[in-house]
Swiss-Prot record:
Site (described: Important for GP-C-mediated membrane fusion): K33
Protein's organism: Latino mammarenavirus (isolate Rat/Bolivia/MARU 1924/1965)
TM segment ranges: 18-33, 454-474
Family: Belongs to the arenaviridae GPC protein family.
Glycosylation sites: N90, N112, N127, N180, N248, N386, N394, N416
InterPro entries: Arena_glycoprot, Arena_glycoprot_zinc-bd
Protein name in UniProt: Pre-glycoprotein polyprotein GP complex
Keyword Translocase applies: no
GO cellular component, one term: membrane
Length: 515
């Protein structure tokens, strides 16, 4: 009795403590729920948007829960340092810088005024791109670049059956070569078409003035429903300028060079001379892991080769796709990197046959079709790949990557991510599919086949018995109007063999077992 009285006396204190706990719980729940409501209302997102509006966008954003859109930019400064590079200031002034850290270059100018006095000049014919010393003096440094430039303009004009019209040059002014672009009866029109096409190949898409009348056919609307792509054929060269002048100049950072033209140099026949002389400088890329160890399980671009990314690694799954099809610009770059190890070892044997083998191998590593396709896309003012920036989808949870795709360029700038949104969403879905497929195959490999069969048949048995359970079968007979006769078992006549139910003829019915 005393314990009961003591309990009732302490009840107010217990109630006060319980009430305090309840108040704390209610306050916490209300605060948390209020924060969730603010987040779902979009107020915080609006403040973030207003704060960041107008600022530069990051090229790394989330797609779904674990996938991120990222990019890597390759630094070609060291990769192409030994080869000539080109750039354009405007439609009339174009520059070609010499290899390495040279201070000289070649200036290509389109003008309507001649710089050479015809009476004091000598005429040089088809052998100008073989022996330029007949035209100018003291150009040992410029000779390689000049040969490449002329070879590209003439489109391998030295082949049998090809002829070029004469050009003008003047020794007294150093390196000075002048082309007369005026169409005359003396100048074969096919030759000028080839020269103008070579200029378009060198100078890029912004110089579409090189092409006049074209037969346009097979026009189709693109997937973005904003552009129409047409196949052009039988284009005739055309330009409003009368003269093309090539002369030497000092290099003062005239403009930003385009290394896509330099890659064309490496792929061209005249470029083999550069590769032969500078092979060791050309193959200076390395493969390593994040700690600098040689050749890891996957591919890593070292810090000097990547802009703003430090060391960037890609897993073996993404790289294995490069062995399936030769249709990726990123894979072409990796083939050059991977070739580095054996090439440097082979350079210990300096025989001419070995060098020829190496140069031919380099030429086969990069896809000619891809390179030409991107150059043609540039000429037609269609977004093209310049082999510099590549985008990919990164799974932040598992560290998996998609095969990097080239970030296309249009009008001198990279496309906005929204222009190829369908592509990176498709890549994200493909990465999910690959991961699920690999996980399924991995689980299949760890599971015995007999266990799978047992699981299948047991599941089938369970489903069958489930229907039987729902339907139910009658288990015994009842006398209509009377109680359960169990444990006696009645016959169809309503009697039991033990004699307890001995009067036959009573009506019976089947009854299910009680559950």
């Amino acid at each position: 009795m005393g314990q009961v009285i003591g309990f009732f006396q302490s009840l107010p204190e217990i109630i006060n403590e319980a009430l305090n706990i309840a108040l704390i719980c209610v306050a916490l729940l209300a605060t948390i729920k209020g924060m969730v409501n603010i987040w779902k209302s979009g107020l915080i997102q609006l403040l973030f948007f207003l704060t960041l509006a107008g600022r530069s966008c990051s090229h790394s954003f989330t797609i779904g829960r674990f996938h991120e859109f990222q990019s890597v930019t390759v630094n070609f400064t060291q990769f192409m340092s030994y080869a000539p590079s080109s750039c354009s200031v405007n439609n009339t002034h174009h520059y070609f810088k010499g290899p390495q850290n040279t201070t000289w270059g070649l200036e290509l100018t389109l003008t309507n005024e001649s710089m050479i006095n015809i009476t004091n000049s000598m005429r040089v014919f088809t052998n100008i791109h073989h022996n330029v010393t007949n035209c100018v003096q003291n150009i040992s440094e410029h000779e390689g670049v000049l040969k490449w430039l002329l070879e590209t303009m003439h489109l391998s004009i030295s082949k049998p059956g090809k002829h070029i019209a004469p050009v003008m040059c003047e020794r007294q002014k150093g390196l000075l070569i002048e082309y007369n672009l005026t169409m005359t009866k003396d100048h074969h029109p096919n030759y000028w078409n080839q020269v103008l096409y070579g200029l378009a190949k060198l100078l890029g898409s912004s110089k579409r003035l090189w092409f006049g009348a074209c037969n346009k056919a097979d026009c189709q609307m693109q997937s973005d429903h904003q552009h129409i792509k047409c196949n052009y054929s039988n284009c005739k060269g055309y330009t409003s300028f009368k003269y093309l002048i090539i002369q030497n100049t000092t290099w003062e950072n005239h403009c930003e060079y385009n290394h896509l033209n330099t890659i064309h140099l490496l792929m061209s026949p005249i470029g083999q001379s550069f590769i032969t002389r500078r092979l060791q400088a050309f193959l200076t890329w390395t493969l390593s892991d994040a700690l600098g160890n040689d050749l890891p399980g996957g591919y890593c671009l070292e810090q000097w080769a990547v802009v703003w990314f430090g060391i960037k690694c890609f897993d073996n799954t993404a790289m294995a796709k490069c062995n399936q099809n030769h249709d990726s610009e990123f894979c072409d770059m990796l083939r050059l990197f991977d070739y580095n190890r054996n090439a440097i070892q082979s350079l210990n044997d300096q025989s001419q046959a070995r060098l020829n083998l190496l140069t031919n191998t380099i030429n086969s590593l990069v896809s000619d079709n891809l390179l030409m396709k991107n150059k043609l896309r540039e000429l037609m003012n269609v977004p093209y790949c310049n082999y510099t920036r590549f985008w990919f989808i990164n799974d932040t949870k598992n560290g998996r990557h998609t095969l990097p795709q080239c970030w296309l360029v249009s009008d001198g700038s990279y496309l906005n991510e929204t222009r190829f949104r369908t592509q990176w969403l498709s890549e994200s879905n493909s990465l999910y599919t690959e991961m699920l497929t690999e996980e399924y195959e991995k689980r299949q490999g760890r599971t015995p086949l007999s266990l799978v069969d047992l699981c299948f048949w047991s599941t089938l048995f369970y489903i069958s018995t489930l229907f039987a359970h729902l339907v139910g079968f009658p288990t015994h007979r009842h006398l209509i109007g009377e109680g359960c006769p169990k444990p006696h078992r009645l016959t169809g006549s309503g009697i039991c063999s033990c004699g307890h139910y001995g009067i036959p003829g009573k009506p019976v019915r089947w009854t299910k077992m009680s559950r």
